[in-house]
A protein has these predicted regions:
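Phosphate/nucleotide-binding beta-alpha loop and adjacent structural elements of enzyme active sites
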Residues: 1-204
Length: 204
């Protein structure tokens, strides 16, 4: 059975995830209350008060706040890794810097959040493209017509999150994602839609 390792630095969110895993009798997910960064140690999170309304998933590393333990990926002693998802609110480059030996050893497919205004996003793309991965854009719209509950009211407009799918060149490459030619390319939701419209293929 495949194992899924999940690292969530916010203790209460980690506890909620662990409770969901337990209540649904899922046996192949392991939840760790840890931050992942460039090195082992401790980091501060700008955690909001959970009694207020907000997006608790948008917490990021800060100069002060709640102190949590941090590790780098190589500390996960596993025999193989096929896929990694990184969503750490602008801290992606630090995670990748700390995971270089891990990534080069396992050559996983990596899916990470991209913020075009951040230099660190370009550093991530540059690293992957220079170390044997091809990179593709993926715009995750917050609303889709084929959503699970079939809601037709789109309250989000065209809002979504831009991400990068990095695939080792030794593996089969997707043909339904826009491929990057350079770390300096700047895509957005409109360009993403145009790619699928021009190619007349289903939106991913």
């Amino acid at each position: 059975m495949e194992r899924f390792l999940h690292s969530q630095p916010q203790q209460i969110i980690s506890q909620c995830l662990s409770a969901n895993v337990l209540l649904n009798n899922i046996k192949n997910i392991e939840v760790y209350t840890l931050a992942v960064s460039s090195k082992s140690g401790w980091v501060y999170l700008d955690t909001d008060e959970l009694s207020t309304k907000g997006r608790y998933g948008s917490v990021s590393v800060a100069d002060k706040g709640h102190l949590v333990k941090s590790i780098n990926l190589i500390e996960f002693k596993i025999k193989e890794c096929s896929f990694i998802k990184i969503d750490v609110e602008g801290h992606e480059w630090e995670v990748i810097q700390g995971a270089e030996s891990f990534l080069n050893l396992h050559k996983p497919v990596v899916y990470f959040e991209a913020k075009k205004e951040l230099t660190s996003t370009r550093e991530c793309i540059k690293w992957f493209m220079g170390n044997g991965w091809d990179c593709y854009w993926h715009f995750a719209f917050w609303y889709r017509k084929n959503n699970w509950r079939k809601h037709q009211d789109n309250i989000f407009g065209g809002t979504g999150d831009m991400n990068i799918l990095a695939v080792p060149r030794t593996k089969i490459q997707p043909d339904n994602f826009p491929k990057l030619q350079s770390e300096n390319e700047l895509w957005d939701g409109d360009l993403y839609l145009k790619f699928y419209s021009d190619k007349q293929i289903p939106l991913v």
